[in-house]
Amino acid sequence: MKTILIIPYRDRVNHLMYFLNNSLPKLVEAIPNLEVIVVEQTHGKRFNRGATINIGYDYYKNDDYYYITQDVDVNPQIPEAINFYANEVKDNKFLGIYSDGDTLGGIVKFLGSTFSKTNGFPNDYWGWGHEDKELENRARHFNCEIEKLITFHEFDRKKKYFKIFEDNHIREECGKWHDAYANFDRHSKDVQIINIKNNGLTTLKYKIIKESILKPNVKKIKVEIL
């Protein structure tokens, strides 16, 4: 089965090159039929991690593929961490390979059919944070199984398993904390499903500005989110 690794990206060229030159060869060896798509968002708007991942999924849009979200600054260090990526994931499950305790951020694996059912990430989380909590909200709404292997706050374990670079860029915070952490659960199931259907893969609008091949199994698309 094909596995698509999606890297949301902007202005982190050193981190990207490190990942492609050091981590990717190990992942290619462990995961048959692995392809990588780097989704680079243009400037002019705050970075939108959720929408860029949605675009990476939409580019292939196959219910039967595995997908892995991969932050560009996180690199598996030891064979056990590499093997986490190769774990099989059944339908209706999200596997948090490296994620927060109550969100689906960082490195997450799922089947295309599962991501499609939850309508992916919302598209209106501009700036840093909270889109990963929204994805977990959607997973819970659809009674998806959620498994976490290593969480952000397990400091000793994450240092053992991953090499993580510091982000020295100024982070512009997303102002939708209440939507993700408080308001979602206040709504009825009927209102939740309306909100999910009206914001995600089905409402995604973007334009591909440029496509390029970085390596034989690595493609980069530069996109404008509309």
Q: Positions of the model-derived regions?
A:
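C-terminal catalytic/acceptor-binding lobe
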Residues: 19, 127, 133-226
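Cell-envelope/extracellular polymer assembly enzymes that use nucleotide-activated donors
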Residues: 2-4, 35, 134
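Short beta-strand-to-loop acidic/aromatic patch adjacent to the donor-nucleotide binding site
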Residues: 63-77
